[in-house]
Amino acid sequence: MKKCIISMLALAFAISANAQEKGDDMQPLPHKIENLELLDLRKNITKIPFYGEKNILIFYVDPDKYKQNHEFTVEMEENHRAAGENIEGLGIKKQKNTIFPNAIVRSIARKRTEKNNATIIADPDCIVAKEWGLGDCNNYFVLMIVTKEGELVYCKKGELTKEEQAEFYEVVDKYR
């Protein structure tokens, strides 16, 4: 009996440790967040644009997984479903764990801003994930909504299913 209980406790501990390793430690939503100092595409320190002024739709992108949700984001851009006078969108590129040199990633981001007037800033040390309680964001495209009151109300990591895309549109409609 003792061996069975010890085995069960060891298994529970291993499962818990494995969940923490995989980054399953995201804070529950909604929760308050702070504006952070990141870098613009010229490596100058900048705060997150529009924070406290408007609701913000944030694309927190791992350059290694930039194709996650590609069709969805193109569709969103073309149909303007996430656009409105009360919301602004911006991209934050994670730099810490990418296989690509930062200069190349910055160059690609600058070209994108020239093409569609996007706002893109850089997170060189995964500060956003740490400070905002997002858990592990490595190898994920993360879609977030931050209210103008500084509250993170929506956060999804990875490839969104059709159901999650529909859920996103329901949420973003409240903040447009």
What do these predicted regions represent?
Residues 66-113, 129:
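Structural microenvironment flanking redox-active thiols in thiol-disulfide oxidoreductases
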Residues 139-176:
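Thiol-/selenol-based redox modules, centered on thioredoxin-like
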Residues 4-13:
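Sec-dependent N-terminal signal peptides
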Residues 36-55:
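A short beta-strand-turn-helix
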Residues 49-72:
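Short active-site neighborhood of thiol/selenol oxidoreductases, capturing the structured segment around
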Residues 17-34:
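N-proximal helix/coil linker or "cap" segments that precede and/or mark the start of modular domains
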Residues 1-4, 19:
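Positively charged n-region of N-terminal signal peptides that target proteins for export
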Residues 33-34, 115-119, 134-144:
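Structural micro-motif
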